[in-house]
Amino acid sequence: MRALWVLGLCCVLLTFGSVRADDEVDVDGTVEEDLGKSREGSRTDDEVVQREEEAIQLDGLNASQIRELREKSEKFAFQAEVNRMMKLIINSLYKNKEIFLRELISNASDALDKIRLISLTDENALAGNEELTVKIKCDKEKNLLHVTDTGVGMTREELVKNLGTIAKSGTSEFLNKMTEAQEDGQSTSELIGQFGVGFYSAFLVADKVIVTSKHNNDTQHIWESDSNEFSVIADPRGNTLGRGTTITLVLKEEASDYLELDTIKNLVKKYSQFINFPIYVWSSKTETVEEPAEEEEAAKEDKEESDDEAAVEEEEDEKKPKTKKVEKTVWDWELMNDIKPIWQRPSKEVEEDEYKAFYKSFSKESDDPMAYIHFTAEGEVTFKSILFVPTSAPRGLFDEYGSKKSDYIKLYVRRVFITDDFHDMMPKYLNFVKGVVDSDDLPLNVSRETLQQHKLLKVIRKKLVRKTLDMIKKIADEKYNDTFWKEFGTNIKLGVIEDHSNRTRLAKLLRFQSSHHPSDMTSLDQYVERMKEKQDKIYFMAGASRKEAESSPFVERLLKKGYEVIYLTEPVDEYCIQALPEFDGKRFQNVAKEGVKFDESEKSKESREAVEKEFEPLLNWMKDKALKDKIEKAVVSQRLTESPCALVASQYGWSGNMERIMKAQAYQTGKDISTNYYASQKKTFEINPRHPLIRDMLRRVKEDEDDKTVSDLAVVLFETATLRSGYLLPDTKAYGDRIERMLRLSLNIDPDAKVEEEPEEEPEETTEDTAEDTEQDEEEEMDAGTDEEEQETAEKSTAEKDEL
């Protein structure tokens, strides 16, 4: 019997051990398997729902409470039109997803503005929470992003009404107009700006959006949506906010970058740096702190010191709590928008140092601005602005001029950054101006990319240009000439060419070198003040350098008579002056073209006519025979005093400087009709009747018109005049040959004398002999080496035989 009991007990123990072993196998298998690794079909729907609920639980709510909330919450369906709108927003309107944070912060700022206004008349409005802030917190573990404000909050009815529909009325009309605008290729930004749809940009990055809100007149409620439907329920946690709203985003997998602190901080500083209310981000930093040393370390040190009794007695009185330095990660709210929008204050209240500090922070420059202007524009559109002129031109200022977008002007709407991606907020020639523009009149459009289409921007642009030119005009003359003009002079010249409406204002800012002073720059106003009594034109000469311009034959008589001549030494200068029809009632005269006339008396006129009659044979001979295909006509010059002749362009032709510039254009293909027309224009050949060469030519022509030497001399004079007048020769070889012929004649060398031929060189035999000797020596050396090797081999073989 006892044996049976023992046997039964053993069976029970074996059975129990087997069950425990099976359980251990199952548990081990469950632990090792990664349940979140994949979403296999083997899972039940309840398991999936449970895992999602655990993933998106809010602070203070566990998974079961979340599930209970969803079961009891009141469900609402978006209207069909709202669904269309949602798809439009998510898929097409927002090209840049990062603006979701800008929109949420902007809405938070509006809510804070509302509660602040209410508090002015209701002293209890801020009782729930006195601080007015926006706080942003990233939760990487739960994949959540929280944006909390202490604004006015929303009641249950407002949650349904404001967040359940995109527009309270007119949604159908809006969609119809948007469809029509898209079909016509027009901008939809003006239409979108009429509807508050910024909140829905959250669905660009979130699968679900949860809004927790507390209004002073209602209990705290939770609104939740996945963009298909939404639900609202009272918050079982009670009043956790005090007052305000928390928007929680359950981010999409591809939007996980928005949980990075650096990303969030950069977006806040980019878009919301100048919001009126403080914006905080929950962030970490490493700090070094001192902590009491551990007891073990202190005991160890005491044990080591106890070896010396005297030392212990001396140090007992000096013992203090021992500390050590430890690095700790500390989490706290970090303020993001510490730079204040000084443009919101009256300019009289802002100190110069504040402008300089703001410029350095705003533009990331280390130097102070050269000039600035702070103003408020009113009228068709009201906006505030601060504009700056930098001390030096930005690098690559003219790279891709006209096609490159300028990002120096930043547009804000109610202190919310909208964009700096403009083609035409400022004209191209003012692409160096930096500043901010803040308007309350512009709509916070959904599609900021098309904002530049807005009609009010044209008004803003016009006022910005006027204020910029006023700012530049006020720069002191010394500072303007020495600094501004060196850095931005080309921009002003381009402005004269491009900006017709402001051409007169820009002309007053022009500076050029002139014959009045060897180095100082002069303005057109100063030139006009120094003009001679009967002078009715502003004279200018264009050249590659000042030296070339002032040594040109065209300015000889002008300078001799005391007229001031402006020197144009930059490639854009002549274009600039051509774009100016006149200045202060005085027209411009290019001294390298026809039209230069001097006031002369009757006696001078009679003398000139007599000279023209005297040289008529030479002039006709040049025009009809010697230079028949090269010039339009030949005339006696009034502008030459030292040079024998010059080549003068017609009033609408190219000067030598302009022709050189046009031919240097990289895109010049020769197919442009107007270019070919100007390039093919014949010039007027002017001669100096007092020059000895010209007088001798007249004598020779009268003696023999068919003299080849005289014909060659005429052509050489023409080609020399072409070069001295700034033009290029089409055939430089022919010009060189003619110069050589003239030199031969001047040295009494026969023009047909040939160049002596070089003597033929005999072949050098010594080189070949030396090569043969060298080869023979090499062969003898090789033979000698071979004999020595054979002898060594024979001796070695004999020695081996002897050993054997």
From Swiss-Prot:
GO terms for cellular component: cytosol; endoplasmic reticulum; endoplasmic reticulum membrane; melanosome; midbody; perinuclear region of cytoplasm; protein-containing complex; sarcoplasmic reticulum lumen. GO terms for molecular function: ATP binding; ATP hydrolysis activity; ATP-dependent protein folding chaperone; low-density lipoprotein particle receptor binding; protein phosphatase binding; protein phosphatase inhibitor activity; RNA binding; unfolded protein binding. ATP binds at N107, D149, N162, F199. It comes from the Eukaryota. A motif (Prevents secretion from ER) lies at residues 801-804. The modification N6-succinyllysine is found at K404, K633. The modification N6-acetyllysine is found at K479. The modification N6-(2-hydroxyisobutyryl)lysine is found at K168. Pfam families: HATPase_c_3, HSP90. This is Endoplasmin. It comes from Bos taurus (Bovine). The gene is HSP90B1.
